[in-house]
């Protein structure tokens, strides 16, 4: 029985490695750049005139042939501005019809693309610019003053003017070709920033080979029905439309739409601006969106809107699947979604900036979301039995209580060419199915490392002696920092996080960064920040504050306001509790697990007053 369990999970007891159920596909010897790989996809039979991207707010569309031509024209203009191989281009822009073309143009020259969140404060943006050292910045007119104020020496290229200039060119699209940039698959392509527990974002360097691997992986997973199953009979790549409400300046959105849908040949419907259920569902209906990629707060809002006004019954939807990532999706939200949208499959995927996108995904064919059937890890290390909870009631009763697992909801199966280990954080033991440990992954999409940070790279990427990847992904394993287990079917579950990051509205918030800000307040003696559960946001940052002597007047709203003016909106402190001291180890490290006890003590104290 145990052997059968291991085989079904893709687990090899001899090596301790879990392997994807997909056949290996990555061509390690292919000496291509990402543009050399992706741009020919746009001229495949039947794709030239098909919309690659549609702006749902205006109806404007860009065909695959048009996307290719625009990318190459913009590349020519940027080359004239001095951008070339190895130089960094910062892209500061919200989602738009032209975001992918701007990105592909930069990559076509062998330059490195570093996208930035427009919501960053000037100080936060300055830190990224100082670290990335961009040669030039592609920026919208609205955001240009912010960037000019913090990086006066960086050459600014206004997106609106650039697009107007290349639109005036009259040469034949068919004669356009890639610039001779001499780019290799091991050259740096992307420099996206990932939050860290040190409080400073780290620049994640992904190569052209990483990007190719992710595009090929998504093409296979989505083109095959979602995760290893055969294509549904009615499935047609040419008829697929993906709803784009995710920011493309984050890796989930970038990999999904600049890599995935472009490789698949599917149309991406961009819904610009702040997320709105009304705008999104209108676009889903009007443009026949079949798959929608979201983060959990969007699911919560969709359910609330549907329950409030009968949204699904009034709309004729082709929507088949909603895929959520960025933070755990709670079981209760999945159940409510299913009752509101019974014809739509809701599942999760999992990925990191360090993996250049998605590494696990729920299978559309096999209903991998785990809401109907979930295997919990045994309460002990005894592996002589299989614990299967077949109903929601049983699952709730047997929940492990982990804060990150969404109540036993699967994050899917390993993507093509991805391998994994489950490692005991204390002993380093490699664990079999249904044992909980830290998830390590490797594959051809795993990052090269962190920019100018050898120490962080060495901690994150672990070389395993004598271990060679079967997928051409190298020998280094990425430590994800997440506690997970794999069940007997090969489904992966997140139980908790080893890392201390707060996931607020699917954004990563580093407690140490907020603690540094709080430490500058003249009336605060000591402070710590930890997550506080929130129904809509998942988690919100909450501060534990020790007042300085003589500062009894300090109030919660003053602390919140002080931090709010110094960080991006999603990072701001939402709650404050005043305590006598912050629990720390002898070395001064905050004992974060004990902060919950401080909160309970504070609540109990107030209830007795």
Swiss-Prot record:
Protein name: Putative 4-coumarate--CoA ligase-like 8
Keyword NAD: no
Organism: Oryza sativa subsp. japonica
A single BP term in Gene Ontology: phenylpropanoid metabolic process
Listed EC numbers: 6.2.1.12
Required cofactor(s): Mg(2+)
Keywords in alphabetical order: ATP-binding, Ligase, Magnesium, Nucleotide-binding
A single cellular component GO annotation: peroxisome
């Amino acid at each position: 029985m145990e052997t059968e369990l291991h085989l079904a999970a893709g687990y090899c007891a001899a090596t301790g490695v879990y392997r994807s159920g997909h056949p290996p596909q990555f061509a390690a010897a292919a000496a291509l750049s990402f543009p050399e790989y992706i741009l020919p996809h746009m001229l495949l039979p039947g794709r030239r005139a098909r919309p690659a991207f549609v702006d749902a707010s205006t109806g404007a569309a860009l065909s695959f042939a048009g996307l290719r031509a625009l990318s190459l024209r913009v590349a020519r203009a940027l080359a004239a501005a001095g951008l070339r191989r190895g130089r960094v281009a910062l892209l500061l822009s919200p989602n738009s019809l032209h975001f992918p073309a701007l990105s592909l143009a930069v990559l076509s020259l062998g330059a490195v693309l570093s996208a930035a969140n427009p919501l960053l404060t000037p100080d936060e943006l300055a830190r990224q610019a100082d670290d990335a050292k961009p040669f030039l910045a592609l920026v919208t007119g609205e955001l240009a003053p912010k960037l000019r104020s913090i990086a006066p020496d960086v050459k600014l290229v206004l997106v609106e003017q650039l697009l107007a200039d290349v639109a005036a060119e009259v040469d034949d699209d068919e004669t356009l070709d890639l610039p001779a940039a001499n780019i290799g698959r091991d050259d740096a392509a992307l420099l996206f920033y990932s939050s860290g527990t040190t409080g400073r974002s780290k620049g994640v360097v992904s190569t052209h080979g990483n990007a190719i691997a992710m595009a090929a992986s998504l093409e296979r997973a989505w083109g095959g029905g979602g995760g290893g199953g055969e294509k549904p009979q009615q499935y047609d790549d040419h008829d697929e439309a993906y709803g784009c409400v995710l920011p493309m300046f984050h890796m989930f959105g970038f990999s999904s739409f600049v890599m995935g849908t472009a490789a698949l040949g599917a149309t991406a419907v961009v819904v610009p601006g702040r997320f709105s259920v009304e705008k999104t569902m209108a676009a889903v209906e009007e443009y026949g969106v079949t798959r929608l990629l979201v983060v959990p707060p969007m699911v919560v809002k969709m359910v609330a809107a549907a329950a409030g006004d009968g949204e699904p019954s009034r709309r004729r939807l082709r929507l088949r699947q909603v895929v959520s990532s960025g933070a755990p999706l709670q079981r209760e939200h999945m159940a409510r979604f299913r009752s509101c949208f019974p014809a739509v499959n809701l599942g999760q995927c999992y990925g990191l900036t360090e993996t250049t996108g998605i590494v696990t995904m729920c299978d559309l064919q096999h209903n991998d979301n785990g809401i109907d059937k979930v295997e919990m890890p045994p309460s002990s290390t005894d592996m002589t039995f299989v614990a299967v909870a077949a109903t929601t009631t049983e699952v709730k009763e047997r929940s492990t209580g982990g804060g990150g697992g969404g109540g036993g909801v699967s994050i899917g199966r390993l993507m093509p060419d991805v391998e994994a280990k489950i490692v005991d954080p204390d002993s380093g033991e490699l664990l079999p199915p249904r044992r909980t440990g830290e998830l390590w992954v490797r594959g051809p999409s795993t990052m090269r490392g962190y920019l100018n940070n050898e120490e962080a790279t060495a901690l994150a990427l672990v070389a395993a002696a004598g271990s060679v990847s079967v997928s051409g992904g190298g020998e280094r394993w990425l430590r994800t920092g997440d506690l997970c287990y794999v069940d007997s079917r090969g489904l992966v579950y997140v139980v908790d996080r080893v890392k201390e990051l707060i996931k607020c509205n699917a954004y990563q918030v580093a407690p140490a960064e907020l603690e540094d800000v709080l430490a500058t307040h003249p009336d605060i003696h000591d402070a710590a920040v930890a997550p506080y559960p929130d129904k809509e946001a998942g988690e919100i940052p909450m501060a534990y504050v020790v007042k300085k002597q003589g500062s009894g007047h300090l109030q919660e709203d003053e602390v919140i306001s002080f931090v709010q003016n110094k960080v991006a909106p999603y990072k701001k402190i939402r709650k404050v509790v005043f305590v006598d001291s912050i629990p720390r180890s002898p070395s001064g490290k905050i004992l974060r697990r004990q902060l919950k006890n401080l909160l309970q003590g504070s609540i109990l104290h107030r209830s007795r007053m």
